[in-house]
Amino acid sequence: MRMLFVTGGRLIGLTLFLSSCLSPFHSSCGDDISRRPGTVTDDSPNSQDSSAAQRGWMHLRTKPYLPPDFDQTVFENLWQRWPAAQRGQAAAASSAERRRMTFSYYGLMAPPGDPDSNVPLGYVDTGDGHRVMNCLACHAGKVAGKVIPGLPNSHFALQSLTEDVRLTKLTLFKKLGHLDLASLKLPLGTTHGTTNSVVFGVVLGNLRDIDMNVDRSRPEPAQMHHDMDAPPFWNVKKKRSLYADGFAPKNHRVLMQFMLLPKNDRETLISWEDDFKDIQAWIESIEPPEYPFVINANLAEQGRVVFEANCSRCHGTYGLNGKYEQMLVPLAEVKTDPVRLQALNREHREWMRDGWMSRYGEDHVDVEPDGYVAPPLDGIWASAPYFHNGSVPTLWHVLHSADRPVVWKRTENGYDQQRVGLEVQEFNELPQSASSAHERRSYFDTRKSGKSAAGHTFPDALFESDKQALLEYLKTL
């Protein structure tokens, strides 16, 4: 995938690939940074079986692997739970406009090419009016107003949606579902666009023995609740393991961990293995989107030189001969928020290492990771906010650690071309006008546990001119 820029009467081709959260990126990447044995990947085209990838996409869009979350009647009545001002607007709106308002309010995406769909992209229609969540609820988002499957959904208001679904069901005398009940004890996410997904995996895994038999006798695990920013899917093909700390093997079984509700017994999970092999093929077939705005090619070329001298040791190189080798940067060096690393207990990691998820240890599981993976930066322009917890709204803020906002709020469809990332308002405190829980969740407060924007200060050593050139280059990746 290439984009051509005209500069000085010449055409310059810059290879464009695009990425994830800008975690550790260092001028020297000291000797203690871990390069564990694994596959070295390059920018050659992905050779996935296209038919498997197509099947994987259809599985996600059409197969209900979980119980329903709500039905169409509940969905059409959610607006009645909103604050008075929005409720009044919804009451006066047409049904089509009210549906669009509901999608916007909860950060739901319409399927690409079908903006009038009643079924959000992140849900499966069961055929009888019920909706079942799929992976795309968190892993299909929009940037600059465009919906992109595989992009993190930085709008998704899972906690607000679940609370309003529960209240609406009670009003309509409908049976509560698994998420309605679980969320009474387990927080789903304190900021729109992030979720408590790590703890979801711990809790669900704790209901199984290592062979995937349902086992409710296991003691309840320690739970360190915190929010995570979903990574972009298009970088999975470059990685040899999964998650911010790289502890889990990259295989189709690990992708099934959010399907571990007791309703899905061992035999059911095993029957889905081929489906999830296809889903993994689809994930690894995704290419990142190209930067849609103007790029200063001369400045970007200067930025490439800065990047390769200062950042490439951790984050790889890009272009025709680019290479990325996955690297774990110790927490003591990167100094980003530690809660994610602390939240996964050793017992959970050993459960994965010893059991079915890792093919009984055949696939490597790191039970003692001491830091975070420096991710590939393909599509970095699109995948804001940055860091594993989504605490930094733009790449400019990544490069200027002292200027990262304490509290920030994004606009719905705006894109900051100058700072490269989310268009945001910045605050020193949470505004008192944010009176409802839903409204408060639209603000990212970096003072909360697990939400710190500290760390990754390596770019502070660069001259400002180098930072501006680097910012321009990152648009081209």
Write out the residue ranges for each language-model feature.
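Mature extracytoplasmic/luminal segments of secretory-pathway proteins
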Residues: 2, 18, 26, 132-135, ...
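Signal peptide processing junction and immediate N-terminal pro/mature segment
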Residues: 21-35
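Bacterial N-terminal signal peptides
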Residues: 10-24
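Periplasmic c-type cytochrome electron-transfer domains
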Residues: 31-477
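Bacterial N-terminal signal peptides that target proteins for export
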Residues: 1-13
